[in-house]
């Protein structure tokens, strides 16, 4: 088990920006809903509006009791609806943009939907901000835009080399966002996080997929020999990083957000099996999918040194808490499994 280098300590405190009225796109999704709850707990946030299309991966239930908070307004709608976006942007002082198609396997089958939502949808938001103005536009992205690395860690200046339609659509949206800062002065910041996990993640993703299968007594499937390396980041730590960028990030800058541990998929599988007291007889090895990048790795010292970011979750405790959530909340994930939303998907050859 290897870990990214630990950033040096810093006494820097982020400089707050005006964050009184915040529009959160994709706020009923996995990461977005966790971020909304974080904002609701902040004393300096007066109003939050969630704009979410409620696709298969977004659900009002993800927001839970937050929906009853008088500071929160929920709007069902698409970021591709320019009229709606214009109306909402005018009412807010900052935008945090989570809304995206995000499942790699689905992008093999539905690349057009990924390009429309992730690129054209981001443009629609940015152009509204260009015309009406906000104090900050935080564009939430992914480490997958850097593509695979044989060695070393990608910092924010590394070239973008996406290999699959999902990552390519996010890389394109990153570039559109940064171009709006350079060309029009839109106060854009971009965050790029490593693989997120935590409570209420849709069961199409690897950790909840494996957890829900183990809970049902079904085998889990491991691509190839399980050698693919990913950095794992608890969703609450990602939200901490995004919040720091919202409040203190420098417009025009990119901030990597990582966790403390790199694991191969086989190592991750072993940790989950141990939590269930299960053996490797529960694992089926299947052929690897196309363009399954062997290794992602980021250097996230910039956000640590400049904004004081520190992950608070260790992977062992985070996985245990995540498994416990899925044990206690079968009503939140079982319907999606029955509907086929979490079915394995592979690139058609």
What are these model-predicted stretches?
Residues 2-196, 265, 294, 313, ...:
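N-terminal Rossmann-like NAD(P)+-binding domain of SDR-like oxidoreductases, especially those catalyzing
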Residues 2-7, 14, 42, 58, ...:
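C-terminal substrate-binding subdomain of Rossmann-fold SDR/epimerase-dehydratase oxidoreductases
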Residues 55, 202, 206, 264:
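Short acidic-hydrophobic sequence patches enriched in Asp/Glu that either
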Residues 106, 205, 252:
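A short, glycine- and acidic-residue-rich donor-binding loop in the catalytic cores
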């Amino acid at each position: 088990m290897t870990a990214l280098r630990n950033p040096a300590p810093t006494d820097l405190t982020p400089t707050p920006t005006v964050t009184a009225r915040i529009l959160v796109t994709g706020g009923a999704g996995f990461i977005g809903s966790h971020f909304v709850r974080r904002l609701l707990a902040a004393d300096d946030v007066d109003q939050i509006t969630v704009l979410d299309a409620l696709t298969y991966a977004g659900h009002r239930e993800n927001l839970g009791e937050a929906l009853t908070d008088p500071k929160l307004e929920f709007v069902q709608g698409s970021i591709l609806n320019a009229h709606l976006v214009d109306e909402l942007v005018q009412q807010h002082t900052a935008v945090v943009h989570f809304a995206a198609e995000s499942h790699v396997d689905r992008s093999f089958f539905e690349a057009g939907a990924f390009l429309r939502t992730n690129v054209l949808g981001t443009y629609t938001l940015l152009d509204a901000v260009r015309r009406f103005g906000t104090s900050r536009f935080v564009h939430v992205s992914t480490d997958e835009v850097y593509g695979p690395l044989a060695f070393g860690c990608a910092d924010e200046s590394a070239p973008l080399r996406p290999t699959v339609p999902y990552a390519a659509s996010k890389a394109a949206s990153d570039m559109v966002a940064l171009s709006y800062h350079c060309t029009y002065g839109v106060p854009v910041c971009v965050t790029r996080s490593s693989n997120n996990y935590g409570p209420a993640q849709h069961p199409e993703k690897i950790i909840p997929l494996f957890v829900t299968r183990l809970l049902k007594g079904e085998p889990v499937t491991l691509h190839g020999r399980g050698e693919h390396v990913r950095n794992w980041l608890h969703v609450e730590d990602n939200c901490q990083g995004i919040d720091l960028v919202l409040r203190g990030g420098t417009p025009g800058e990119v901030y990597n957000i990582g966790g403390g541990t790199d694991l191969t998929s086989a190592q991750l599988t072993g940790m989950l099996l141990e939590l269930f007291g299960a053996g490797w007889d529960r694992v089926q090895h299947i052929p690897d999918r196309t363009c399954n990048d062997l290794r992602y790795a980021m250097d996230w010292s910039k956000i640590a040194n400049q904004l004081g970011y520190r992950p608070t979750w260790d992977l062992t405790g985070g996985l245990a808490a995540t498994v416990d959530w899925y044990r206690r909340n079968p009503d939140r994930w079982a319907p999606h499994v029955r509907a086929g939303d979490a079915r394995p998907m592979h690139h058609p050859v």
